[in-house]
Amino acid sequence: MEDFVRQCFNPMIVELAEKAMKEYGEDPKIETNKFAAICTHLEVCFMYSDFHFIDERGESIIVESGDPNALLKHRFEIIEGRDRTMAWTVVNSICNTTGVEKPKFLPDLYDYKENRFIEIGVTRREVHIYYLEKANKIKSEKTHIHIFSFTGEEMATKADYTLDEESRARIKTRLFTIRQEMASRGLWDSFVSPKEAKRQLKKDLKSQEPCAGLPTKVSHRTSPALKTLEPMWMDSNRTAALRASFLKCQKK
């Protein structure tokens, strides 16, 4: 699974996931399913923000050309992927600027058009079950919840899906592709089932050989969302690195 993750996701997403796990004392080489889940969640957050801007009239627009326009502002602020200290700094700054209520838990995004924090969920289970778990944990009507599954299902607060259908379809397609790629390598069952995951871990520890059949070439796509990670905490070199294109699993 670890080899698959490093082949399937952008190196900067992998790095952010590793740092997040180490911050909580977790080892990506051992807890590989969690490693894959965190990388997937990060990519969904970036894709959620991709191409969405606010124009000078305050209207939400979609721009895919990548041409710079000084009158456009990113619609979403990405909070997920930052270390906890800086993430709370961003949240506090948003709250002070907009006057919105400070959440008790770190959200994943902030929507400048709707003026609300967003909690993104990616589940291997039933979407309604995961949604209820999220809602019960957050216990706040101010934070919008949007759940995606690997089967193409989704659920959002008050059935308000925030994004247009095409943008959501891109996310669903990516998740389905990840599922198919895992399944083709015999990794999906262990990713879904905790019992199977333990069995797979024991098997992985016995054999350190790289996973057969991993793609050696991947397609490239630039993600404008990575630019929104710039404020407050990145030097120019890291910003340039984050602007590197996403690496995707090779389609069969």
Curated annotation (Swiss-Prot):
Site Important for efficient shutoff activity — annotated at K202, K203, K206
Reading the lineage from the top rank, the first entry is: Viruses
The entry's localization annotation reads: Host cytoplasm; Host nucleus
Sorted alphabetically, which Gene3D superfamilies does this protein's record hold? Answer: Influenza RNA-dependent RNA polymerase subunit PA, endonuclease domain
**Might you name a Gene Ontology BP term for this protein?**
viral translational frameshifting
GO molecular-function term, one example from the UniProt record: RNA binding
Which interval of the chain is the signal sequence?
none
- Residue(s) at site: Important for efficient shutoff activity and nuclear localization: K195, K198, R199
Keywords assigned by UniProt, alphabetized: Decay of host mRNAs by virus, Eukaryotic host gene expression shutoff by virus, Host cytoplasm, Host gene expression shutoff by virus, Host mRNA suppression by virus, Host nucleus, Host-virus interaction
Cite the active-site annotation.
Answer: E80, D108
Annotated family: Belongs to the influenza viruses PA-X family.
Question: How does the entry describe the domains?
Answer: The probable endonuclease active site in the N-terminus and the basic amino acid cluster in the C-terminus are important for the shutoff activity. The C-terminus acts as a nuclear localization signal. The C-terminus is recruited to host protein complexes involved in nuclear Pol II RNA processing.
- What function does the entry list? Plays a major role in the shutoff of the host protein expression by cleaving mRNAs probably via an endonuclease activity. This host shutoff allows the virus to escape from the host antiviral response. Hijacks host RNA splicing machinery to selectively target host RNAs containing introns for destruction. This may explain the preferential degradation of RNAs that have undergone co- or post-transcriptional processing.
Protein name, entry field = Protein PA-X
